[in-house]
Amino acid sequence: MSSEEALARLAAEEQQLQFTLFNPDTAWQLGCALRQEAGRRGLHVTIDIQFAGQTLFHCAMPGTSPDNAEWIRRKRNVVLRFQRSSYAMGMRLTLRNTTLEAFYGLDPADYASQGGSFPLRIVNCGCVGAISVSGAPQLDDHLLVSEVIARFLGINQ
């Protein structure tokens, strides 16, 4: 699969993985599912779900540090600004041989295009938040989030 095909697949994934309803109970259930799956995969991650500027779920698993929460903040900023997954944005920038700082003038202290933050989309509403993890390699972070969301929504990928 070419990089362009991979980007198209990521865009389709982002459009497919949308919620019809999202509230604090949904965030709790999804966050717990992410934590359980991270444990099953042997990953030590911090998990964060933010909706409309409010943190609805946050969990730092054993083996993580405050740096993971900082990575989440920076990756989440990318999702909220571009309404794309941080992994897709990183891949797009790599294809263009540029960075968030060079292309958009964004401070790397506040924005990170490494994988692990995914748009929280509600059908007919758009991006209303972000579901983020940090602690594993960026592809593993991305796959943890996207695969758990898909399972949570009953969507086969």
Curated annotation (Swiss-Prot):
InterPro entries: PduO/GlcC-like, PduO/GlcC-like_sf, YBR137W-like. Pfam families: HbpS-like (PF03928). Belongs to the UPF0303 family. HAMAP family: UPF0303. PANTHER family: PTHR28255, UPF0303 PROTEIN YBR137W. This is UPF0303 protein NT01EI_1570. It comes from Edwardsiella ictaluri (strain 93-146). The lineage of its organism: Bacteria, Pseudomonadati, Pseudomonadota, Gammaproteobacteria, Enterobacterales.
